[in-house]
Structures are given as structure tokens and as C-alpha cells.
Amino acid sequence: MKTENSLAKNLSAADNKAALDASCKRLLANKIILAWILKECTEEYKNCSVDDIAEKYIEGTPQIAQTSVHRNEKSGENIDGLNTEDSSITEGTVTYDIRFGAVVPNTDDKIHLIINIEAQNDFYPGYPLIKRGIYYCSRMISSQYETYFTESHYENIRKVYSIWICTRPPESKKNTIMQYSI
């Protein structure tokens, strides 16, 4: 009798529904798939094995579209865990598809990254996706205040990545990776 692992179960469940949001997020949140994404899309992991990335460098369990603590409130919930919802009284709420932390390999100091993976069905949603990606990165940076840094200790800000996977790109954009950095 064959036993399916969690990746195989998620692939089976998604079968003809892979474009459905929840199924797609569950598939992308698998640590092995995340490890492949990190290996191919980030400089920090390009020389690492996929197994090492999944087992040694991805921290904890990647969070999938879960609610969080309101970032403007002080409470015992304001900890090192990564939530997928970023709320601000003045800026509204952003819900990240998948969000997790990772450690940079082969560094003297333990350097942490905050990584967001977005599954995007519509390649042309009526606004520039790049601007939305920049906005998400900006929110991930600003939300670190009072969690990873306070006052003027900007040296403690963690590097962020927002990686967007377009599930239905136009023919000319299929099998491509576009990178933007600021």
C-alpha cells in the first residue's frame, strides 16, 4: 500500500482546482516547494541544496492567509512569529498569501529574512503588479517597528522579499522570472 506525504495529498486535492486560491496557497507553502522558489529566486540560497534550505534555513511553519494581531496595539502577541495579515489603523489591512522567516546560510551573524510568496492569477489586474509588490515589501519593512527594531535602530531591519508567482501569465511571459529590487 502506498502512503502519500503531505505534498502528494495537496497535489491530489488541488487536481483540477490548482488555480483556486486556497489549494494554490497550500501547495506553495510546502517547505520543499518554498525551498525551490528560494533557490531559484534569491541570491542567498542559490548555492544551497533544496533539502538544506527546507530543513535548515526556513524557520518554523510558513503561515498561510491567517489573521494576526493588530500591529498598532501592544500585547503579549507582539512576538517574533510571522503573521500573514498586516493591519494598521492608518493604512488598512494587507493579507499576505504566504509569509515566513528564513536564516541566511554561511553568515557569521545570524541574518534573518522575511519572505512573502503571492499567487497571482491575473497578470494584468488593472494596476501595475510591481507597485503592489513594492507596497507589500514596504509594509513588511514598516511592520518590523516595535518587533525587530525600536526608536532609531534601523540596523535591525530585516531584509524582505515578496515573490509573486503568476499562475496564468500571457504566452510571452510564461516560464520567466522578472526581478525588481530597491
What are these regions (language model features)?
Residues 1-182:
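Accessory alpha/beta interaction modules
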